[in-house]
UniProtKB/Swiss-Prot annotation:
Function comment: Involved in iron-sulfur cluster biogenesis. Binds a 4Fe-4S cluster, can transfer this cluster to apoproteins, and thereby intervenes in the maturation of Fe/S proteins. Could also act as a scaffold/chaperone for damaged Fe/S proteins.
Domain of life according to the entry: Bacteria
Key words of the record: 4Fe-4S, Iron, Iron-sulfur, Metal-binding
Family in the record: Belongs to the NfuA family.
Ranges in coiled-coil conformation: none
Binding positions ([4Fe-4S] cluster): C151, C154
Organism: Mannheimia succiniciproducens (strain KCTC 0769BP / MBEL55E)
GO molecular function terms noted in the UniProt entry: 4 iron, 4 sulfur cluster binding; iron ion binding
Classification via Pfam families: Fe-S_biosyn, NifU
Biological process terms in GO annotation: iron-sulfur cluster assembly; protein maturation
Protein name, as recorded: Fe/S biogenesis protein NfuA
Cofactor note: Binds 1 [4Fe-4S] cluster per subunit. The cluster is presumably bound at the interface of two monomers.
PANTHER family the record matches: FE_S BIOGENESIS PROTEIN NFUA (PTHR11178:SF51), IRON-SULFUR CLUSTER SCAFFOLD PROTEIN NFU-RELATED (PTHR11178)
InterPro entries reported for this sequence: Fe/S_biogenesis_protein_NfuA, FeS_biogenesis, FSCA_dom_sf, HesB-like_dom_sf, NIF_FeS_clus_asmbl_NifU_C
């Protein structure tokens, strides 16, 4: 795995914090609940006695970052920055693979489609309290989807399916996927977005 990208500004910030700690203290980058929708990334101090034999050490100019073996694959393509905004400065940690491991390009179609749904489509639907689940891919090449949360019973679900989800999936999986179909039994209720 390649090194986690830590900007110069973030490295400077960590160095300042580490200067106030016991000598030999470095940082630990980790993921809590990796591979789940509730995954959260974090950074903590890592004193010398907290380094495990199974940790991966990533060396930077003035310190090292340690990552435990469970978190490691979920931190692939992660970036840490220290951003200055109007309201002050803030440490940002982007880890696109924290919620789900990246799937290989030659993985079965169902795994690749599910990965796109979980990492690209569901985050868009989450603003409406909605989500979709991939049920199966038919022999004819259709992704069978189940809508849940705010999408269930929403009057806009057909538009979301045809113009949003299906279009995105067919473009990404051209030649492999013909379309998407909804098998949800929509029950309109207070949970429905529209």
């Amino acid at each position: 795995m390649q090194q986690i990208q830590i900007s110069d500004a973030a490295q400077g910030h960590f160095r300042k914090l580490l200067d106030q700690q016991e000598e030999g203290t470095n940082i630990r980058i980790f993921v809590v609940n990796p591979g789940t929708p509730n995954a959260e990334c974090g950074v903590s101090y890592c004193p010398p006695n907290a380094v495990e034999a199974t940790d991966t050490e990533m060396k930077y100019a003035t310190f090292s970052a340690f990552v435990d073996e469970v978190s490691l694959p979920f931190l692939e393509d992660a970036e840490i920055d220290y951003v200055t905004e109007e309201l002050g400065t803030q440490l940002t940690l982007k880890a696109p693979n924290a919620k789900m491991r990246k799937v290989a390009d030659d993985a079965p179609l169902i795994e690749r489609v599910d990965y796109v749904i979980q990492t690209q489509i569901n985050p868009q639907l989450a603003s409406h309290g909605g989500r979709i689940t991939l049920v199966e891919i038919t022999d004819e090449g259709y992704a069978i989807l189940q809508f849940g949360g705010g999408c269930n019973g929403c009057s806009m679900v057909d538009v979301t399916l045809k113009d949003g989800v299906e279009k995105q999936l067919v473009e990404l999986f051209a030649g492999e996927l013909k379309g998407a179909k909804d098998i949800t039994e929509h029950q309109r209720g207070e949970h429905s977005y529209y």
